[in-house]
Regions:
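Membrane-interfacial helix-loop segments of redox and metal-homeostasis proteins
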Residues: 1-248
Length: 248
């Protein structure tokens, strides 16, 4: 699942972020193609994972006594201190980049500093809120729940207003090719994230939280993206670069 999703995301010019959550607010047609194809891929994968092949056999064992949950305060304190040190280190780095690092020509502030600041904020928010784009898509077909999907849509509405204001100030939006690559990539991405149980965002913060399953998904994702990079030159023109970049 990770390999399929990684390959699909890159051939589609972005994952659930670049070709959906931030792609649609930037008015790029390719993001709409990718999103619709992703929904189809999610639906197909939801049918596939319901097959007996993917159903784990559960063996129920009678419990004779309760085992209390033990906590290790010292271990928790160590990880808290490490987290604080990492946060302080990143903050110092950002301040240094903004205050002392020479900025590229035509830039008023370091792009790396802005990227790091936004990355830290985004990672903290999706981790604490447990935002999962996979469940937002998958649950529509599997359980009928739409809470996460509604939350994502509201976020995109707010993002659209913000992006539009920047466009009015003269900042160009990120518009990608609206070609077959987005449809192929969207389908593969949607299928892969359901099979893997996590999307590009979800596996990252869950892997850091210690969920070993998502370490494997992440490795597969890197493999899939690498396969795309190695083979991109063979089909870039017929599938992507020969098609127009359509700005809505």
């Amino acid at each position: 699942g990770g390999i399929i999703a990684g390959f699909g995301a890159r051939i589609g010019m972005g994952c659930n972020l670049a070709s959906f959550f931030t792609g649609i607010p930037q008015f790029s047609v390719h993001a709409w193609f990718f999103t619709l194809a992703t929904l189809v891929g999610v639906w197909v994968a939801a049918q596939v994972v319901s097959l007996p092949l993917f159903r784990s056999k559960v063996k129920l064992v009678a419990a004779t006594e309760q085992k209390p949950i033990t906590q290790n305060p010292a271990r928790a304190k160590i990880f808290f201190v490490l987290g604080v040190l990492v946060l302080v280190g990143i903050s110092v780095w950002i301040v240094w980049l903004m205050a002392f690092k020479p900025t590229p020509e035509g830039k008023n502030i370091s792009p790396l500093a802005i990227a790091m600041l936004c990355g830290v904020g985004f990672g903290f928010i999706i981790s604490r809120a447990q935002i999962c784009f996979t469940s937002a898509f998958r649950d529509l077909f599997v359980t009928g729940r739409g809470m996460m999907a509604r939350a994502v849509i509201v976020g995109m509405m707010v993002s659209t207003i913000g992006v539009f204001s920047y466009i009015m100030l003269g900042m160009p939006p990120k518009i990608m090719w609206a070609g077959p690559n987005t449809i192929i990539g969207g389908f593969l991405f949607g299928f892969g994230i359901v099979l893997a149980g996590g999307c590009e965002c979800g596996w990252m913060y869950r892997a850091v939280e210690g969920q070993v399953h998502y370490w494997i998904v992440g490795i597969g994702n890197v493999i899939g993206a690498s396969l795309l990079a190695l083979t991109w030159d063979y089909y870039a023109e017929p599938l992507a670069t020969s098609f127009p970049r359509i700005n809505l």
